[in-house]
């Protein structure tokens, strides 16, 4: 009887360890061992969707810090914001969306010159460019991505153009990440 109980306990512990390992795989694989978790916060919300169904959302926000990780693509006055939205269904299938936003600090002369070029009809990355999907990157808002990010609770601050989005890919739905 004791042997059976011990075997069941070992199996249960392996199952729990495996389940937790799968949750943390993305963090460990992507960020590696040089990451420090600065803060972690979990909130629980109950909402009603458009069809009237009641949905419980448990949102976990992690703020992590990784030092001296320059991919060799950033200039002196540039900042990269990476936003990941990972949607997992009950079967374990994942859909991963990664958005990279490169922010450049421009001088007033450069900004004025960009607006003149944009008004003349030329393409300008910092000017009011409207892509094929209909959102303006000048305003820093992507309605198609931001709604997915808010629904998943990850990084909508970066998509909303506040500059306060999710530094390492995680942030609160309010954009309160770093």
Swiss-Prot record:
The interchain disulfide bridge is essential for the intracellular transport and secretion of fibroin. InterPro entries: Fib-H_N (IPR049375), Fib-H_N_sf (IPR049376). Residues 1-21 form the signal peptide. Keywords: Disulfide bond, Repeat, Signal, Silk protein. Produced exclusively in the posterior (PSG) section of silk glands, which are essentially modified salivary glands. It comes from the Eukaryota. Residues 149-178 are annotated as: Highly repetitive. Silk fibroin elementary unit consists in a disulfide-linked heavy and light chain and a p25 glycoprotein in molar ratios of 6:6:1. This results in a complex of approximately 2.3 MDa. Core component of the silk filament; a strong, insoluble and chemically inert fiber. Composed of antiparallel beta sheets. The strands of the beta sheets run parallel to the fiber axis. Long stretches of silk fibroin are composed of microcrystalline arrays of (-Gly-Ser-Gly-Ala-Gly-Ala-)n interrupted by regions containing bulkier residues. The fiber is composed of microcrystalline arrays alternating with amorphous regions. This is Fibroin heavy chain. It comes from Bombyx mandarina (Wild silk moth). The gene is FIBH.
């Amino acid at each position: 009887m004791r042997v059976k109980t011990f075997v069941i306990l070992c199996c249960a512990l392996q199952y729990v360890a495996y389940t937790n390992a799968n949750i943390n795989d993305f963090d460990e694989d992507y960020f590696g061992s040089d990451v420090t978790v600065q803060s972690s916060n979990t909130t629980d919300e109950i909402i009603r969707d458009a069809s009237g169904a009641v949905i419980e959302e448990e949102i976990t926000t992690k703020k992590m810090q990784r030092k001296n990780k320059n991919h060799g693509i950033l200039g002196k006055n540039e900042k990269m914001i990476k936003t990941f939205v990972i949607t997992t269904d009950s079967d374990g299938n994942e859909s991963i969306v990664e958005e990279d936003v490169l922010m450049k600090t421009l001088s007033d002369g450069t900004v004025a010159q960009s607006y003149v070029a944009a008004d003349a009809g030329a393409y300008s990355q910092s000017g009011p460019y409207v892509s094929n999907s209909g959102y303006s990157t000048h305003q820093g808002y992507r309605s198609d991505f931001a709604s997915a990010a808010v629904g998943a609770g990850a990084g909508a601050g970066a998509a909303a153009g506040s500059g306060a989005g999710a530094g390492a890919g995680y942030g609160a739905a309010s954009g309160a990440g770093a």
